[in-house]
Regions:
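Sec-dependent bacterial lipoprotein signal peptides
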Residues: 1-21
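Secreted, cysteine-rich disulfide-bonded mini-domains of extracellular proteins
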Residues: 22-110
């Protein structure tokens, strides 16, 4: 293999690592605009520092990382799963007593 081809392959591999799956947004990430959350989610700006999520997840499901939480009959959102408070980002708590799956939320769920 020529050294030029080797350089191209190494460069392509590094670019894939830098801009590939390791940099994709996950449920619960902070955001400012919808594009911060990739193509499967949107930025819920009512949450502190934004929150990447999917609305109506009972119908369409959540991305690989996330749990679907029903807040009432008409509202369900993909939320960041947790076990303890330190699993959540700053300013968020792990809600453990609202539905079957603990999740990170800015305030205790009603």
């Amino acid at each position: 293999m020529s050294s030029r081809l080797s350089i191209v392959l190494v460069t392509a591999t590094l670019a894939a690592l830098l801009f590939g799956t390791g940099c994709q947004a996950v449920v619960g990430d902070a955001c400012e605009i919808n594009t911060d959350c990739g193509t499967e989610m949107y930025c819920e700006r009512s949450m502190p520092e934004g929150y990447c999520t999917v609305k109506s997840c009972e119908v369409i499901g959540c991305p690989d990382y996330g749990v679907c939480v029903s807040f009432d009959l008409d509202q369900s959102y993909c939320m960041d799963p947790c076990e303890i408070a330190t699993d959540c980002r700053d300013g968020y708590v792990c809600v453990t007593d609202f539905g079957p799956h603990p999740f990170c939320n800015a305030v205790e769920a009603p």
